[in-house]
Amino acid sequence: MPKASADYIWMDGELVPWADAKLHVATECVLRGENVFEGIRAYWNETSGQLHIFRHADHIARLRQGARIMRMTIPYTDAEIEDACLTLLRANRFRETVHFRPVVYFAEGELTQYLPDEIRTGMFILAIPMPSKSSLKTGVKSGVSTWRRNSDLSSPSRVKSGANYHNSRLAYIEARLN
């Protein structure tokens, strides 16, 4: 099981010690899951002694597309996001395969309805060691869930958003407990 932490998180333009990276409980990110993210893998190559990021630019483009659908303005350019990811990976000195996640979120609001330009948009990137799953070699059991994917007409399921992942969490729990 990978450790669920690293030395640093990149948060709003700065490297922050893992234990000091905090969001207020009144953020829309916490209260309503208003965020978009990408999950990206960087594979460790022992021979070259380097991490190799899988389709980094494509993931950043999809992050930006999801933010656009959610009417969030990412406060960084694609080049700045890519540089932030590299800075974070280097600062943590990983020598193993890593999963990292850039997250764009709405910050503190008025706890009522608001327009996107009336609320601050923040960003953080976290990275943790995550080796390949053993199921790649052993296979998996499968089943049909009673939970159905949310309609794209009610909540854009094509967007990687924290709020959208509750649906898949319910299906996962059902599969594990049955």
Regions found by a protein language model. Name each.
Residues 82-110:
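Short, acidic/charged, Gly/Pro-enriched secondary-structure junctions
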Residues 1-75, 80-87, 111-178:
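Helix-start/capping segments and mature chain N-termini
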